[in-house]
């Protein structure tokens, strides 16, 4: 028996099938050409994977024949045998007529094929309809990749059509099409053919097989030369807001990873035909790890599969390419997968990457968290600060703090360890002292500004001549300092807007303090211009700058938790409740003012003021004002008095239709003074209750921005001196060298997870060299307080700065050993003996 696609040529004892009879040959049957062997399934394993048969049992697509039976058939001269498989009864053997048998071939009609007929056959899984396709192509000297067999709009081929029309996970026309393409020397072109339209551009049969989660077809395509680096970069596969589509990183490996198919991922990376490049990037520079971060959506199920796949690919990459730092690769925006998770607000993926601790010895260098020691519920962890601290470009802290206000989970991400403790460390060691000093300087500036404004000259036109008196010297000095402060705030605002380029929403949500300081500086500069242009209106600009200057004092409340949260609530109520109230109120005010001013007539009853209007102006030096209210401005002022409860229903008598006039005023009072004001009060109370926790997180974000701004104002040498953490040895690199990391120690308490699965543990808990020089933190929720544990000490790193100058920093080695085995409940009896607690 000769199995179709098998490499052996042994005979078969089974009789041939009726529909597999070969065409007769001229001359001696023994001299006929040997049938060509297709190579769709080069191994028995691949053949059985697709059809469930092996060499021991004839598969449904095998062809059986005996050479001796060919003599009974009439013979004509034909070209070599080509076998075309049938779905039900096994393959039939079709032959292309040679040029010497044109007369014999003309007696039989040649079946014609076009794109529509081929597409219908593959869509219906109809192999019988395609039995003569190879003969037709060879006769007409055409290929399946010719333009007449493609969709003119999308470039779709018959193979892509077959891949899109699977029946129970398979389509028997696919191996048939591949064999036909092999016989016509177009196999590589057919397998790697892709869509050409702008929407699905670049999608190949391999992409479709992966998307359909069909391991057998993926294997078949890769065995036959499918390009594992083909990029699907059509509009459907791009991340575009408001447009349907699915971004997965363009490459087949990324598609398998983003659709949670670990088996296909391993096959693409480890197959012997064409292994995929694990570090390959798409058109925007994203690797497979970047693509996983992009598809994360912060839901529980999605985060679970993304983090699991991320971990598997990271470990697999380390085993295949030990020296490759896959997680350190950046995209075209300069973002690593960690920075991308922070930029896009993927808090679940961010927390996993920051707190990843791998126990396998050969992959432990991939960890970013190392458990130094554990004692009961107490854990001392070392966090790798690479890509986190501000010493590096596009650090996680900068990405989160300076990201857009539309970034989801922006405030919550700063609560993830070690970010939370790292910011607190920076604040406690040096930032708060600088911040309080700046607060003092600003208070002094505002006092000088206020004094200079209060004692301004009032006689004559500016600029005023200097009187050589002590008071005038102090006044002019105060004015100069006030102007210099305005110039400083102006250029600081320009620098902020150029660096951050905030959107309009970000400007009002996150940058309101910077915007107010900038407006204050504009009023101050306007004051200077008007002053030297001989306009007394400079006073108006000056008082606006003065008022905004004292209002901006709220910026420094972020240095105090309670006051900072209170300031955030004020901001939120202004932007949310008060803005909506003012919009509705102005509509009512303008509408009723136009109605009232229409009723008022000038000159009517002017000579007869009423007693109710006169009694308000009795007294020495008082006189009745002009009783004309036939202007929108004066009417709006009177109606505003009704809003605050100071209005008079008889503020004028110059109107017709008194009943209509009174009804308008009463309706206005009910809608504004009674309804709108009380609604505003109720909404403010509800806002305070709703945003209490949110306000605390916003305050922490504001303080984080202040910390980073203060750090950025330092010189480079000063940044290194005040850097948090220590350089520690945490293990060994894959090439056997010492693995030094800049680490930050955080001590935690966890009453649910004990030290049964700790991979790295120190023999002497809490007695580590350098722990006295590294901050231990007082963690209020689930953390160890440095004041409550004996061997913990809080020594500011500022004290270390001078020591570092005198003694160059040397890498500090922390001896970490593997905790072999795991503790079981029944092993707890061992610890009743103090000796069982370990070596001391």
Curated annotation (Swiss-Prot):
* Principal location class: membrane
Residues covered by region (Disordered): 1-43
Segments in the Cytoplasmic topological domain:
1-433, 499-511, 558-560, 685-840
Region AD: list its residue ranges.
686-714
Chain residue ranges for the region called Required for PIP2-mediated channel inhibition: 779-794
Glycosylation (residues): 605
Q: Where are the transmembrane segments?
A: 434-455, 474-498, 512-533, 537-557, 561-599, 658-684
**Which stretches does UniProt call biased (Low complexity)?**
1-12
- GO cellular component terms listed in the entry, alphabetical order: dendritic spine membrane; membrane; plasma membrane; postsynaptic membrane
Q: Using the UniProt annotation, give all residue ranges assigned to the region (Interaction with calmodulin).
A: 769-803
Q: Which InterPro entries match?
A: Ankyrin_rpt (IPR002110), Ankyrin_rpt-contain_sf (IPR036770), Ion_trans_dom (IPR005821), TRPV (IPR024862), TrpV1-4 (IPR008347)
Which positions bind Na(+) 2?
645
In its record, the post-translational modification comment is: Phosphorylation by PKA reverses capsaicin-induced dephosphorylation at multiple sites. Phosphorylation by CAMKII seems to regulate binding to vanilloids. Phosphorylated and modulated by PRKCE, PRKCM and probably PRKCZ. Dephosphorylation by calcineurin seems to lead to receptor desensitization and phosphorylation by CAMKII recovers activity.
ANK repeat ranges, renumbered to this chain: 111-139, 154-186, 204-229, 250-277, 286-322, 336-359, 394-416
Q: Report the domain remarks.
A: The association domain (AD) is necessary for self-association.
Subunit-level organization: Homotetramer. Interacts with PIRT. May also form a heteromeric channel with TRPV3. Interacts with CALM, PRKCM and CSK. Interacts with PRKCG and NTRK1, probably by forming a trimeric complex. Interacts with the Scolopendra mutilans RhTx toxin. Interacts with TMEM100. Interacts with PACS2.
Q: Which family does it belong to?
A: Belongs to the transient receptor (TC 1.A.4) family. TrpV subfamily. TRPV1 sub-subfamily.
Identification of the protein by name: Transient receptor potential cation channel subfamily V member 1
Source organism per UniProt:
Canis lupus familiaris (Dog)
